[in-house]
Every structure is written in C-alpha cells, then in structure tokens.
From Swiss-Prot:
InterPro entries: G3P_acylTferase_PlsY (IPR003811). Its main location: membrane. The chain crosses the membrane at residues 4-24, 56-76, 80-100, 114-134, 155-175. It holds the Pfam family G3P_acyltransf. It catalyses: an acyl phosphate + sn-glycerol 3-phosphate = a 1-acyl-sn-glycero-3-phosphate + phosphate. It is a multi-pass membrane protein. One of its GO terms (cellular component) is plasma membrane. This is Glycerol-3-phosphate acyltransferase. The gene is plsY. PANTHER family: GLYCEROL-3-PHOSPHATE ACYLTRANSFERASE-RELATED, INNER MEMBRANE PROTEIN YGIH. Catalyzes the transfer of an acyl group from acyl-phosphate (acyl-PO(4)) to glycerol-3-phosphate (G3P) to form lysophosphatidic acid (LPA). This enzyme utilizes acyl-phosphate as fatty acyl donor, but not acyl-CoA or acyl-ACP. GO terms for molecular function: acyl-phosphate glycerol-3-phosphate acyltransferase activity. It comes from the Bacteria. It is found in: Cell inner membrane.
Length: 196
C-alpha cells in the first residue's frame, strides 16, 4: 500500500504539472499567459487575454487536475490521511510544473478540485465564498486569498480529518499570492470588472 500511495503522489504531481492555461492558449493561437497580462498561467489571466469560454475551459481542466488523482486514490482505497497529501502534490505540480520549467500558476482551481471529493457541500461553500468576494470587490486574487484562508475552517466542521492537508494547501496558495497581497495593500492590484 505504501508503494501505491507513493505512486499516486508522483502521478498527482505529474498530472498537476500539465498546464491547462499554457496548452489551451497555445492551441487557441493566444499568447503565452506567462508573458501576457498578469503573467500567471491560470484561468483568471486567460480571461483577461481572451474570453469567458476559453477561461472556463482552463478552469474546468485545472479543477480536474486536482479531482482526478484524489478520486482515483479514493477508489484505490488509499488511507484517507494520504488523500490530502495526494491533493497537495497535485497543487505543487500546478505551481511548479516539471513540464514547464517549474513556472506555474497559483493552484486555486486545482486546490478546489482536490477538495471536491471531500464533499459537494464543501465545494459549494468554497465556490460561494469566492463568487461573493469577487462580486463585492472585483478582485479575483482577494477572492482566492479569502477563500483559501477560510477553507480550513469549513473543513474542520465538515471533515476534520483533512484539516492538516487543507492548512498546507492554504499556506502554499497564500505564499503564491504574496505579490498580489502586496499590490492589494498598495492599491495597485488589477480588477476583472470588465470581464464579469
């Protein structure tokens, strides 16, 4: 079982390393999201440089990168504790993809994907939190920061077994948003008003 768990952790990282934003933009004839807009290969930046359909495609694929390995591990009857670490591995792949010189995104959608198998109630709460903050502030980055900050609290009340992996995910995503946090404090962070 240990070998199977390690295999799934590695597989999750490799799946996470497939950058949906870069590949979708490449196939759509769009500029590389790492060099355009906010320079972040994620759905929000794809929304900035293209349209809602393309961004939604990236969002869906990024969510799947988290959901597939965690659900796969669940069906393989891997211990619940390790499911969280498999999810963290998928997010690390998104953030530091081996296939794209370790320059990836911030893993917000992939993290959501890893948490969906815990329960749709949790997924609904996370999506609702993100949408509410975006609607109120028009800042996608702030919505992500608020959502991942409150996620461990949601998990504590719904499935406390997964609190520690969720805390790890939240810490990683907050670290990846450090530049956004600085810009938010300075009032220079860009909004997505024109696209919503």
């Amino acid at each position: 079982m240990l070998l199977l768990t390690l295999t799934m952790i590695i597989a999750a990282y490799l799946i996470g390393s497939i950058s949906s934003a870069i590949l979708v933009c490449r196939f759509s004839g769009l500029p590389d999201p790492r060099t355009t807009g906010s320079k972040n290969p994620g759905a929000t930046n794809v929304l900035r440089i293209s349209n809602k359909f393309t961004a939604a495609t990236v969002l869906f694929l990024d969510i799947l990168k988290g959901t597939i390995p965690v659900w796969g591990a669940y069906f393989l009857k891997i211990d619940s504790l390790y499911l969280g670490f498999i999810g963290v591995s998928a997010c690390l792949g998104h953030m530091y993809p081996i296939f794209f010189n370790f320059k990836g995104g911030k893993a917000v959608a992939t993290a959501l994907g890893t948490l969906l198998p815990i329960g749709f109630t949790l997924g609904g709460l996370l999506i609702l939190t993100w949408v509410l903050v975006v609607k109120l502030t028009k800042y996608s980055s702030l919505a992500a920061i608020v959502t991942v900050s409150i996620a461990p609290l949601y998990v504590y009340f719904l499935k406390p077994l997964y609190v520690y992996p969720t805390l790890m995910l939240s810490a990683l995503i907050l670290f990846r948003h450090r530049d956004n946090i600085k810009r938010l404090l300075k009032g220079t962070e860009s909004k997505i008003t024109h696209k919503i």
